[in-house]
Structures are given as C-alpha cells and as structure tokens.
Amino acid sequence: MKKIYQWAVGQSFKKLDPRQQVKNPVMFVVYLGALITTILCFYPMGIPLWFNISITIFLWLTLLFANFAEAVAEGRGKAQADSLKQAKKEVMTYKINSLEDIKEENFIELQSSDLKRNDLVYVRAGEQIPADGDVIEGAASVDESAITGESAPVIRESGGDRSAVTGGTTVVSDYLVIRVTSENGQSFLDKMIAMVEGTQRKKTPNEIGLQIFLITLTIIFLTVSITLVPFTDFSSQLSGKGEALSLVIVIALLICLAPTTIGALISSIGIAGMSRLTKENVIAMSGRAIEAAGDVDVLLLDKTGTITLGNRRASDFLPVHGVSEEQLADAAQLSSLADETAEGRSIVILAKERFNLREREFQQSEVKFIDFSAKTRMSGIDYRGDVIRKGAADTMKKYVQSKGEDYPSECDKIVDKIARAGGTPLVVIKNNRVMGVVYLKDIVKNGVKEKFADMRKMGIKTIMITGDNPLTAAAIAAEAGVDDFLAEATPENKMNLIREYQEKGHLVAMTGDGTNDAPALAQADVAMAMNTGTQAAKEAGNMIDLDSSPTKLLQVVQIGKQLLMTRGALTTFSIANDIAKYFAVIPVLFYSIYPQLDRLNIMGLGSPLTAILSAVIYNAVVIVALIPLALKGVRYQEKPASQILSHNLLIYGLGGIIAPFIFIKIIDLILSLIIL
C-alpha cells in the first residue's frame, strides 16, 4: 500500500496537466481559479499578500487532493494489473496443422505472439498455454492460479462446457490440443489488464448524468460570482460603506460554493467500485455493468451450485410393501458400488451407516457392473444370478412393465411424495421386482434463505432456474425462500422470461457457463459468465467470474448497490456542504456594506478574509477526509431504498450541513489567533 501512495503522490502532480484537468469540468474551474490567483499574487490589487498567497496555495492543494484520490484508486488497479501482467509473457509453443500431426517431427516451434486465430497448438504437462482457446483433443489438469488465485488445478477437456482455456495458465498433467480463439493482444488476459488498469474505462450514464448536474450547479454559481464584483461596487458607492469584493475573494467564494467535493471524488468512486469487484475475482467488461448490478431488481439464479450444493445425497430408503428397509438398502448399495457419482457414493455410505452394510469383495467372474448411459437411463449390477437396477421412476416403470411384471401403485405414491418434498426419487428393482425408492435430496446451502429474505427487503425478486419438474422445483423454491421459479428450463424460455421482465421495466441479472446460456446472457442487463464456461458464454456476458461460483452474483449486486449508495451519499454531503458554506460565509462578506447582515453571522466569524480563507481550507481538507470513504464505499445495508435514502439524508445530508459550521469556525479561530 505504501508503494501505491508513493506512486499516487507523483501522479497527483502529473495530473495537473490541463489536458487531464479539462476532463473534469468542475475541477477545471478550480484549476483556472488557481491559475488566476497565482498571477494575482504578483499584482495584489489592495488585498493583503498573505491572504492572496494562502488562497492560492489551498486552491492548488484542492486540485492535488482530488488528483491524489483518483490516483490512489488507479494505483490499486495498477497493482492488480501488474500481477496479471506477470502471467502474460512470451512463450515458445508447438503449432500443428491437424490432429493427425501429433508427432514431434511435425511440430512447428514458434513464439506465442505469432499465433493466429484458429491455429492448433499442442501443449504438454509443465508448459504454459500460449493463448485463449478451446480444447479439441485431450483432457488435463490446468493450474489457473495466475488468473484466478485458486491454487487447486482444474480439469479442462474437449467437448462439453469445460473446454475453454485461458492464455497464461499452465498444464499440470497430460496434454491438450487447443484451437486458438483470439488474436495477439485481444486475449481474455489482455482485456482483463486493460479493464483493471482503466485504459478502457468510459464514463457510465449515471456518471455523465451526475456530471451534467454538477456542471449546471457550477455554471449557476459562476454566473452569480461574476455579478458580485459590479454588484458590490455599486452597492458600496450607493451606501457609502464598505468596498467592492476583490477578484481573489470572488474566485475563492466560487470554489467554496461549487460542488468540488463530489467533483473531486466522482472518478475515484467509480474506479474503486471496479477495484472492489476485481478483488472478488470478478472482471467487469464495463463500468456500466457494475452500475446496472446496483439497479438490478430481478435475479435469475441456477438451482445447482447457487441455491443447492450441487450434489444430491441419499437421505432415506423407502421400501414398498413386503420389502424391508434393509433389503432395499442392500440392493441399492450393490447397484451403486461402481457408481462414482456423488449420488452413488452417498447411497453406499447411507446403507453402511444405517445397517452396517459393507462394500463387498467380488470375484471378477461373478459380477458385472452396468454403467449408466443416456440411452438406458439406468445403472446397476448382475451379481450371483441377481439382476439389480436403479434409475429414474419413469424409466424403471417402463422397464418393469416391459418384462411383463406389475409396477406397484404404492411406488408411484412414494415417488410423488418425494418429488413434492423437493427430492429426486431413484427406483430400485431386483430381478424385475420393485424394491422401493431411494430419496435423493438436494441440499440447500446454509444461509441462502436469509440472503434471499434480505434481497426481498431491498425490492429484489429472486427466481430459481432449474431443469427439474415443477413439483420438485416448487419444493426446493419453498425451502430456499426464493420468490418464484422456472421449472424444466430451456435456453428459449430463459430468454423469454428475461424479455418479459425487461418489457415491464425491470433490470435482470443472471449467470451462465454453457453455449446454450449465451442467448440469455446476451439479453440480460447483468450477465456473469463463468471462467470455466465456453467461449460463447464469456463473449455474451458483461462480467466474468474467475472463481466460476454462481453464488457470486449476489455479491456483485451488493457491490453495484454499494457503488451507487456511495456516489449518492457523497453527492448529498457535497451539496449540503455548499448550502452550509453559503450561509456561513455570505453574511460576513457583505456586512461591511450592509451592517444589518451582521445578525446572520451566527458563527461570529472574525473577518471577511479569515472567513473566506477558513472556507477554502475546509473545502480542501474535507476532500482528504472523504478519500477513504470514496475508496472503501459506504457501509452496505440490506434495506429498502426508501429506508436507505432516509438514512443517507440524515447522516450525509444533516452531517454535510453541520460539519462546515463546526470546522470553519474552528479554522477561523486558529487563523484569528495567528494573524493577531
């Protein structure tokens, strides 16, 4: 952090370049004012030189403090970008012309920067993946810690939704043949570095709108200030008292009344918001996406991995009439001994825990394991003349009936009961006889129900997306506490649901990782793609989660809302400050011409010169005081918007009015003692 501050100090002076200053119109007015007062130091025009120099110094400090706030925010991003740049380095790689060329004598050795889109490269264990691409052959463990920070390697393989690889990651085992999907300089890592450094950061619509508002206020105060010189000159001549305000005092008054506090911090608030998101290992492709996350009022959440743990577990054995629970458990365990899925392992463990049934040792000749296939939709075992199978209820019903056996209606009732409870029924048969049903339960993650309740308080509607049947979906939705659900979801009805809410004026957020998610991701206002997902999903999203955790969407929404809350709170504080400074300073400046105004000098400020200088000093110092808040953000509160508004008006509105009166008075007392 020390290095960031040192770098930021240097940048504060570099940013005094007028080409940089003109990008922020409010602070550019301060810049012009500082230049004019600097020139006037050589031509005092009846104003004490100490006053002129003091005003000039604190106007320049106001600019430097504003530059420092922005530079610190940029410095954090730069530090993150530097760590990413270490992953992006030139490496030698092996290009091949086709999959048939996977022989060392056919390898073409070249630099990674020379690769073109659609080139095929061969990457072995220990070698760095040279560019973004899709795996078209092979399966390997890949170390993605350079990108995600996660030390555990992940599996990347051809086909499916885990085929995308990122340049800069390292193959740990086996080999991969990769088709390059990006040109040099346009990789995912390049985009990450550009976004984190802020080189591609554009002002968001909200920022532009706020800046227009601040410029309008500044123009109003500028117009008022310009008229003060002739007005006070005329008034002093008419009343025969006092004298016209000097140009230095008018400039100082303008800077005090203009919304310089929020003008100084507006850029750093936006940059810090993106930095907070990056710390959560989420890369936003634009600041607009973060702001949209703050305004989101509909969340589409995948059931698996977001609401539930993702692995269903066996929780009960429910036998049909004439079969004991232990007999069902024995058959279910036998049928699952070769099943390496989480569900299969949980059946073996539950049977062991309930009835002390241990895994058997078999002779190869007496056992035949039947693996699950998409065609048969069942798995099982042939063991010592017994044929044991387990599978989905509808599949097993057809299987039993095809063998000419009766399928008990009792089993249908058990299946229906499990589905209504939100579980998945797995029917077990032995020698064409139905033994009963294994109850596989989706385990809802701890704390999600409370999280969804908080979202509801904030006016955010949560919708669970699942491929389960409506009965199962309804039960899990009730247990998790979501507001609605979409069962038997397809890419088409996901996209239609998003459009339906958008047409009603809602902003919708969702996550996705597969090619089939791409259309819905492209349609959503906030679309967070998983880093483990396909290239199509990443390109359709406007955010990428490097940890590939769908639950992260909730944190993204919180960060977006925190950014908007911070900007709103500091804008409220800044404008309240301006109002307070107006009533604190104006009576003192004019009471020499209009003695009656002395009654409004409720603070008892010493003189016009110390009053205006105190206001200028306060104006500069308050920027420094608010830098930590701008960078960290206001405390996030899971409350309705109306309550948050009331809270911010009380804290930042009332606080913004009281603070100037207190601190300007203290500074004025100190100045009065020094001058005396």
UniProtKB/Swiss-Prot annotation:
Cellular component, GO, one term: plasma membrane
Functional summary from the UniProt entry: Part of the high-affinity ATP-driven potassium transport (or Kdp) system, which catalyzes the hydrolysis of ATP coupled with the electrogenic transport of potassium into the cytoplasm. This subunit is responsible for energy coupling to the transport system and for the release of the potassium ions to the cytoplasm.
Oligomer and partners: The system is composed of three essential subunits: KdpA, KdpB and KdpC.
Membrane topology: Multi-pass membrane protein
Catalytic reaction equation(s): K(+)(out) + ATP + H2O = K(+)(in) + ADP + phosphate + H(+)
InterPro entries listed in its UniProt record: ATPase_P-typ_cyto_dom_N, ATPase_P-typ_P_site, ATPase_P-typ_TM_dom_sf, ATPase_P-typ_transduc_dom_A_sf, HAD-like_sf, HAD_sf, P-type_ATPase_bsu_IA, P_typ_ATPase
Entry superkingdom: Bacteria
Pfam families (alphabetical): E1-E2_ATPase, Hydrolase
Segments crossing the lipid bilayer: 24-44, 45-65, 212-232, 246-266, 573-593, 611-631, 656-676
Localization (cell): Cell membrane
Protein family per UniProt: Belongs to the cation transport ATPase (P-type) (TC 3.A.3) family. Type IA subfamily.
Keywords on record: ATP-binding, Cell membrane, Ion transport, Magnesium, Membrane, Metal-binding, Nucleotide-binding, Phosphoprotein, Potassium, Potassium transport, Translocase, Transmembrane, Transmembrane helix, Transport
Binding-site list for ATP: D339, E343, F372, S373, A374, K375, T376, R377, M378, S379, K390
Residues involved in Mg(2+) binding: D513, D517
Catalytic residues, chain numbering: D302 (4-aspartylphosphate intermediate)
Annotated protein name in UniProt: Potassium-transporting ATPase ATP-binding subunit
EC identifiers of the protein: 7.2.2.6
GO molecular function: ATP binding; ATP hydrolysis activity; magnesium ion binding; P-type potassium transmembrane transporter activity
CDD domains: P-type_ATPase_K (cd02078)
PANTHER family, alphabetized: POTASSIUM-TRANSPORTING ATPASE ATP-BINDING SUBUNIT (PTHR43743:SF1)
